[in-house]
UniProtKB/Swiss-Prot annotation:
One of its GO terms (biological process) is negative regulation of trichome patterning. The keyword DNA-binding applies. InterPro entries: Homeodomain-like_sf (IPR009057), Myb_TF_plants (IPR015495), SANT/Myb (IPR001005). Interacts with GL3. The gene is ETC2. It comes from Arabidopsis thaliana (Mouse-ear cress). This is MYB-like transcription factor ETC2. Its main location: nucleus. It comes from the Eukaryota. MYB-type transcription factor involved in epidermal cell fate specification. Acts as a negative regulator of trichome development, by mediating lateral inhibition. Promotes the formation of hair developing cells in H position in root epidermis, probably by inhibiting non-hair cell formation.
Length: 112
């Protein structure tokens, strides 16, 4: 083991690695409490669910198929859609007058 390797070991990770990890965590890590519900079209929801059944939680592959969406955005959508923790937010959205695809609103629209 020569002297340069010893110096490198003593110094720890390079500045480039620490900058990368710091910027990655600063940009992507957000507390789940601060998440806003992500609205997707029916086509996007269908595509995401089919892709998830096909490839699992490989969000990069799924994001490659959904135009204009990032992998972390799709992952957050999936977590919020399928997690018990966010069920109260979904219920609140379904009861709002602006959300027109709830079963009650569909029945009312059919009667008209």
């Amino acid at each position: 083991m020569d002297n340069t390797n010893r110096l490198r070991l003593r110094r720890g990770p390079s500045l480039r690695q620490t900058k990368f990890t710091r910027s990655r965590y600063d940009s992507e890590e957000v507390s789940s409490i601060e998440w806003e519900f992500i609205s997707m079209t029916e086509q996007e929801e269908d595509l995401i669910s089919r892709m998830y059944r096909l490839v699992g939680n490989r969000w990069d592959l799924i994001a490659g198929r959904v135009v204009g969406r990032k992998a972390n955005e799709i992952e957050r959508y999936w977590i919020m859609r399928n997690s018990d923790y966010f069920s109260h937010k979904r219920r609140r959205l379904n009861n709002s007058p602006f959300f027109s695809t709830s079963p009650l609103n569909l029945q009312e629209n059919l009667k008209l």
